[in-house]
């Protein structure tokens, strides 16, 4: 493991990318759903992902109407909610686990739960839990001002998403406003595993890189070591793997088996980035 990463010196998303860039490395960013199969397994999974060399971990907060998510993550959210997982229980778990991690956590959540709690209160709660980043996929750029202001006030990096169908002017505005990194959605539609990565990603990466020096991470449909390697070769600063991770944890015969498979899979992705 990287000697620069110790639990007591966990830094934010921007600093993580800056460190990796100075080392000529690409960030591995796994995504898992909190509470699937249960929160105790989520806590163990976060530690496994961290120990296998993940650079940032996205943790999905289960929601009953997840518009951006494909079947695997929707099913994970349903299973988690049926178990009684809620925001407070996720925060309690994170308060215990985050001090033991060497990589930062970014929460992936929908806007409604933030609004219900109140934006300022939400930011205070996640900051106190040790969270460094936030992704809210269902908020259009025009409505992010309050979120961005409160996030900045609480030193939470609000990551914005851009897609292959985003017009260039709008993409530039998203790139300008995004903090931590820019999330480039590799394909149109919802999350999920795919056979290959959309080749348009390469030119989109070039376009974004021309507009900014901020790091760009690619996600949606990336599920194999060869996908990870391909996207890194195209010039991405980070690679996000979600549905494949979620399926391993949520659909294994037992939580223990899921954690073993998760470790093996994460190591295979990490190897693809360093080879």
UniProtKB/Swiss-Prot annotation:
Pfam families given in the database record: Trp_syntA (PF00290)
PROSITE patterns membership: TRP_SYNTHASE_ALPHA (PS00167)
Location relative to the cell: Cytoplasm
Active site positions, chain numbering: 58, 69
Its EC number(s): 4.2.1.20, 4.1.2.8
GO cellular component: cytoplasm
InterPro entries in the record: Aldolase_TIM, RibuloseP-bd_barrel, Trp_synthase_alpha_AS, Trp_synthase_suA
Catalytic activity annotation: (1S,2R)-1-C-(indol-3-yl)glycerol 3-phosphate + L-serine = D-glyceraldehyde 3-phosphate + L-tryptophan + H2O; (1S,2R)-1-C-(indol-3-yl)glycerol 3-phosphate = indole + D-glyceraldehyde 3-phosphate
Subunit organization: Tetramer of two alpha and two beta chains.
Family in the record: Belongs to the TrpA family.
HAMAP family (UniProt xref): Trp_synth_alpha (MF_00131)
Protein's recorded name: Tryptophan synthase alpha chain
Organism: Arabidopsis thaliana (Mouse-ear cress)
Lineage, broadest ranks: Eukaryota, Viridiplantae, Streptophyta, Embryophyta, Tracheophyta
Gene that produces this protein: TRPA1
């Amino acid at each position: 493991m990287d000697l620069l990463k110790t639990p007591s010196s966990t830094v934010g998303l921007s600093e993580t990318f800056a460190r990796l860039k100075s080392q000529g490395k690409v960030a591995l960013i796994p995504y898992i759903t909190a509470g699937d199969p249960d929160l105790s397994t989520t806590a163990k999974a976060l530690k496994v992902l961290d120990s296998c060399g993940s650079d940032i971990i996205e943790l999905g907060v289960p929601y009953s109407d997840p518009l951006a998510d494909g079947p695997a993550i929707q099913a994970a959210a349903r299973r988690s909610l049926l178990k009684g997982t809620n925001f407070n229980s996720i925060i309690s778990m994170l308060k215990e686990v985050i001090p033991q991690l060497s990589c930062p956590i970014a929460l992936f959540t929908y806007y409604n739960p933030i609004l219900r709690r109140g934006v300022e209160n939400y930011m205070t709660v996640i900051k106190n839990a040790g969270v460094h980043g936030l992704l809210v996929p269902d908020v259009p750029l025009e409505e992010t001002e309050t979120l961005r202001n409160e996030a900045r006030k609480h030193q939470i990096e609000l990551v914005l998403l851009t897609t292959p169908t985003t017009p260039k002017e709008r993409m530039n505005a998203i790139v300008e406003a995004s903090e931590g990194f820019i999330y480039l959605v590799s394909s149109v539609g919802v999350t999920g595993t795919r056979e290959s990565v959309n080749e348009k990603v390469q030119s989109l990466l070039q376009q974004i890189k021309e507009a900014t020096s901020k790091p760009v991470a690619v996600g949606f449909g990336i599920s194999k070591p060869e996908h990870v390697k391909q996207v890194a070769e195209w010039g991405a600063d980070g690679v996000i793997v979600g549905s494949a991770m979620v399926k391993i944890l949520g659909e294994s015969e037992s939580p223990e088996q899921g954690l073993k498979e998760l470790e093996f899979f994460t190591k295979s992705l990490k190897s693809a980035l360093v080879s």
